[in-house]
Each structure stands twice: as structure tokens, then as C-alpha cells.
Amino acid sequence: MSQKTVKVQLVRSLIGTREDHRATVRGLGLRRMNSVSELQDTPAVRGMINKVSYLVKVIG
């Protein structure tokens, strides 16, 4: 059985954001604007996405 994955895209700049939010975005594997990272769909990853939901977009 394959693992479920979720793709996340950074859609807003990190300029002016809190340091812990920047660290969370880096933890999601995102570096630049419009960069996309494919991650396993786990509760930990979902929590990270929820924390920085104003910066990222979950794509199909």
C-alpha cells in the first residue's frame, strides 16, 4: 500500500513573518516563492501546514 502524500506550495514571501513560522516553512522543505514540496500526509505535517496556512497552499 502506498503512502498518501500532500503537495505544498509557498505562495507568500517570508519577509516580515515570525521566526518560528520561517522555521516551519523550512521544515516543510520550501525555500523560494512558488516552490513545491511533496510530503507524507501525517498529523505532524498537517499541523505544520495549519500553522503557516497564510503562507502556503495545498495543491492537488
Swiss-Prot record:
One Pfam entry name: Ribosomal_L30
GO biological processes: translation
Q: Does the keyword Ribonucleoprotein apply?
A: yes
Source superkingdom: Bacteria
Annotated CDD domains: Ribosomal_L30
A cellular component annotation (GO) from this entry:
cytosolic large ribosomal subunit
Keywords attached to this Swiss-Prot or TrEMBL record, sorted alphabetically, are: Ribonucleoprotein, Ribosomal protein
SUBUNIT field: Part of the 50S ribosomal subunit.
Family assignment? Belongs to the universal ribosomal protein uL30 family.
Q: What PANTHER family does the record tag this protein with?
A: LARGE RIBOSOMAL SUBUNIT PROTEIN UL30M, MITOCHONDRIAL RIBOSOMAL PROTEIN L30
The name this protein carries in UniProt is Large ribosomal subunit protein uL30
Q: To which species is this protein native? A: Ralstonia pickettii (strain 12J)
Gene this protein is translated from: rpmD
